[in-house]
Amino acid sequence: MRSLLETLEALKAPLPAGYVVYRQQGGQQIPYIPWWRVAELLDYHCPSWEWSVTSIQTCGQYLVLTGRLTLHTADSSISREATGCELLDCDSYGDPVSNAEAMAFRRAAAKFGLGRSLYDKAARPASARPVQGMR
């Protein structure tokens, strides 16, 4: 089992090729990591990680889910919480709960450094590019 420092350094490393996928949003291709790839990286770097949903609420037309990601390392355990949301009447892939949970899970992992560069708009101009044929 790695120390906390070693685990955090490993999670901040560049993402393996093929782990980043793109989805269309607002005329741009937005990079993201699917939740199962996040779980795969956590399994590799910190196999004793733990995820729990701490609350599910509705707010107007949205379902808001809060989850807690805990990393258990050789010298400590540390948790980060994050939220995810989805329209209650979503017409995208999945359902509101699983979509919101996937978002919360990815965001909690990003708080540990995993894929954080995808959230840095200044560092991703080559990644977030306009969709072909759209303005």
PLM feature segments, named:
Residues 1-29:
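N-terminal, Lys/Arg- and Ser/Thr-rich interaction peptides
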Residues 10, 134-135:
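Long, charged low-complexity interaction segments
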